[in-house]
Amino acid sequence: MEIKRDIIEKLKAWKENPRRKPLVLQGARQVGKSWALKKFGKECFEDIVYINFDTMPALKEDFRRTKVPAQLIRQMEIMTGKPITPSSTLIILDEIQECNDALNSLKYFCEDAPEYAVVCAGSLLGVALNRSGASFPVGKVNFMTLYPVSFAEYLRAIDAQLYRAYEMIDTIMAVPEVIHQQLTDAYKSYLVLGGMPEAVSAYIDTKDWEEAKAIQDGILQSYSLDFAKHINNKDIPRVFQVWGNLQDQLAREDKKFRYGDVQKGARAREYEGAIEWLCLAGLVHRVSALETPRLPLSAYKKSNAFKLYLNDVGLLGRKFDLDVQTVLAGDNLFTEFKGVMAENYVLQSLVRQFGNSQYYWTSGNMAEVEFVLQADGRIIPIEVKADKNVTAKSLAYYRKQYAPQLSVRLSTLNMRKDDDLLNLPLYLVDKMSQFVSVAD
């Protein structure tokens, strides 16, 4: 089944913008970047010229020889056998991180040929630029990032009627109980499946969890193969060590990343490069601790205290080797993992809505709040509870210490607001930006 992705509407808006620049679509491997650009091209253009620098290396030489858009257009026409016209052709440059000269040419398309619709995709673009020191056309391109399929996108694909009910939830009031339970069940299935498009599509078509798991395993394997292909030989073992240890770090109660758990006696300077590579590749999200929750949060982060979450909760479940029915049924055997699974799920949504700079707060052994968000000039603490047990004291301690205008608790309970505390069901986290803006 083809999954409708929200990124298509954003691409359509880019097309209609009279001040558009060449577009770079970023994102981890296997999240659907190439598919999205081709889908956009089919819906909005008469024709597509598709260039993949990984499979068409001969074009690299053409981009090395000239940066003149007219000459490059002619070379692409000859290579593909298709005419390129500004109003009706979408030019897709895929795996652009493989050709630094093509990246640099975007500046000239912006300045000298803005009438052409040029879009690019690169899974390891940040890694490639960091490794090679290549120049980048700063200010001459537009950026978008594609993430794994969100819960809302997943819901739209599996149950159109339930999705319509979900879309109508736009005020702070209790959700009808039957809808609340159905959405909670859908959330649990999303925890298992995650958002890698191929796995989601396969499950929707077959309802076979084993097939979806096999696809997830294949994606994890492809990530590992990328390590060997794109990392300097001396750094490969450390990236493998960090990647292989992530689930163990997250399984601990505090989830704080400890270098010594990767290898006994390990130091930060030995593994910081490996962590940076995984972050640049979009495979992990780094969440830093705060010295104190003050604006701007970035000025108060602790660089030496952080957690690393995966880019997809379904892949995290595979790294834990969790049994599907254990997750769906909420079995007691799942207790020690459901907290981190819920946190990973929430973080993915926060990154999509608010960007990649996320933080958490702790007061040592007294209390810990899973996420602290900066939005609309406010600091919003977010507590994540994987079930209906919301009696923990951490958020209460934070509220007493800092008196935030608004606090959010995410759990499997229904929606309600108690003074400055907004209780949201976990299935509504994709609407976080909407609800925090109206929760005053």
Summary of predicted features, one role per range:
Residues 201-373:
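Accessory nucleic acid-recognition modules appended to NTPase machines
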Residues 25:
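Hydrophobic anchor at the beta1->P-loop junction of P-loop NTPases
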Residues 33:
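Conserved lysine of the Walker
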Residues 92, 117-123, 145:
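Structural recognition of the conserved hydrophobic beta-strand(s) that form the central parallel beta-sheet
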Residues 129-251:
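Interdomain motor-coupling "hinge/lid" segment immediately C-terminal to the ATP-binding subdomain
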Residues 55-87:
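Short glycine-rich substrate-engagement loop in P-loop NTPases that contacts/grips substrate
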Residues 36, 40:
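Hydrophobic positions on the alpha1 helix immediately C-terminal to the Walker A/P-loop
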Residues 1-14:
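N-terminal pre-Walker A segment at the start of P-loop NTPase domains
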